[in-house]
């Protein structure tokens, strides 16, 4: 479906801008009018990570006049495998500041606005209100639903992308013309069911593939050219090198954009998405130990069985001495319980403590009352006990 241009054109392009954007200007569908609209556009990128990196770089190169960056994190060495807007010299720096420097290095004519804060229900409306279009580069469900609901309530379009291992998805959500994210995914998955990129990994170059698609869609919406991905979900399988599309219809019963919406103001999205389930939270109360406590138990020869509930490829990267591997899903399916000793105390751990808390809830309900898990997981262990080991 063709849509009208989102923004009005700027008054003019300078001589330098004409020279810079000449390859756009000779495209009939873009031309002077389209480039002036890009110059006048205000686009906010939520996140300067895997998707935000290529998105910001190409938005800047394309000549978007104002770019906002929402990012509160710092550059970590593990980011550099895919977050190409940052460099080795940026490790430890603010991601927002690092991204700004890269953007201005690409295009000094861009006005960059930094929002160095976590995007939350109490600031999202004020931040989003300053921009014409949002590019969602987030990697967690709570923020995705927050972005969606804020955009629906403000009647703003946004370009969404998602990546995991070798798979990517992208769409344009604009409730005035089509469905929103909740029409596609009315409810978040159960806590721990879908691994994050930090848990499951992602092919670095996949970020460029999906991020570039997001920028393409942003340009189309801003300039009013082509047929944006409104009402369509694009799915990319990098292993098979296949693209396919699925039609997404507006849900008349959608909680936020439907005929009788029940979400008319922003909610508690962490609670809505159940970042850690109530069962896991209850199980962890009084049954969480620190890496230092575990080290003391090991040194004292305590009668314990340390179980790593991560995936085999994670176990190969780094592990706690003496831990044996039983992936989380084997507990969720019930097949692992029969392998647990009845005469030893079970100590669970994962990468950070989220998955092990979910497994702890399963063990508690199965009668392993003295089972515990390690808060902070193997990452906490490395930081506190064996700093010479790698983290991921």
Sequence positions of predicted segments:
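Conserved S-adenosyl-L-methionine
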Residues: 61-66, 366-369
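Glycine-rich phosphate-binding loop and adjoining beta1-alpha1-beta2 segment
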Residues: 4-12, 69-107
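A short, aliphatic-rich alpha-helical micro-motif
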Residues: 38, 127-132, 340-341
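Hydrophobic/small residue at the entry helix of a nucleotide-binding pocket
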Residues: 51-52, 355
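Conserved N-terminal Rossmann-fold NAD(P)-binding element of oxidoreductases
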Residues: 46-47, 70, 349
């Amino acid at each position: 479906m063709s849509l009208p241009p989102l923004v009005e054109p700027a008054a003019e392009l300078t001589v330098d801008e004409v020279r810079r954007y000449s390859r756009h200007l000779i495209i009939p569908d873009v031309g002077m009018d389209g480039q002036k609209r890009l110059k006048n556009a205000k686009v906010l990128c939520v996140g300067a990570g895997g998707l935000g990196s290529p998105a910001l770089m190409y938005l800047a190169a394309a000549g978007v006049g104002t770019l906002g960056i929402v990012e509160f994190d710092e550059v970590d060495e593990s980011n550099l495998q895919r977050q190409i807007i940052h460099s080795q010299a940026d490790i430890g720096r603010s991601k927002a500041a690092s991204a700004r420097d890269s953007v201005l290095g690409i295009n000094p004519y861009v006005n960059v606005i930094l929002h160095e804060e976590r995007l939350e229900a109490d600031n999202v409306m004020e931040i989003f209100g300053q921009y014409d279009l949002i590019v969602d580069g987030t990697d967690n469900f709570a923020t995705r639903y927050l972005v969606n609901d804020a955009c629906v309530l403000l009647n703003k379009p946004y370009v969404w992308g998602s990546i995991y291992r070798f798979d990517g998805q992208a769409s344009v959500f604009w409730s005035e013309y089509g469905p929103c994210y909740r029409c596609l995914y009315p409810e978040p998955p159960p806590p721990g069911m879908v691994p994050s990129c930090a848990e499951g990994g992602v092919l670095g170059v996949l970020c460029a593939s999906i991020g570039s698609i997001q920028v393409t869609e942003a340009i189309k919406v801003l300039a009013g050219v082509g047929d944006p991905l409104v009402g369509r979900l694009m799915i990319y399988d990098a292993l098979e090198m296949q693209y396919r599309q699925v039609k997404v219809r507006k849900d008349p019963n959608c909680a936020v954009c439907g005929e009788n919406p029940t979400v008319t103001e922003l909610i508690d999205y962490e609670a809505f998405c159940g970042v850690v389930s109530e069962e896991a939270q209850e199980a962890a109360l009084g049954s969480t130990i620190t890496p230092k406590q575990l080290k003391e138990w090991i040194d004292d020869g305590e009668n314990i069985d340390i179980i790593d509930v991560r995936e085999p490829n994670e176990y190969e990267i780094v592990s706690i001495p003496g831990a044996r591997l039983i992936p989380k899903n084997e507990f969720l399916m019930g097949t692992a319980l029969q392998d647990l000793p009845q005469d030893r105390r079970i100590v669970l751990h994962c990468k950070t403590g989220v998955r092990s808390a979910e497994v702890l809830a399963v063990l508690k309900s199965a009668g392993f009352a003295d089972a515990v898990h390690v808060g902070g997981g193997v990452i906490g262990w490395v930081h506190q006990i064996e700093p010479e080991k790698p983290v991921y």
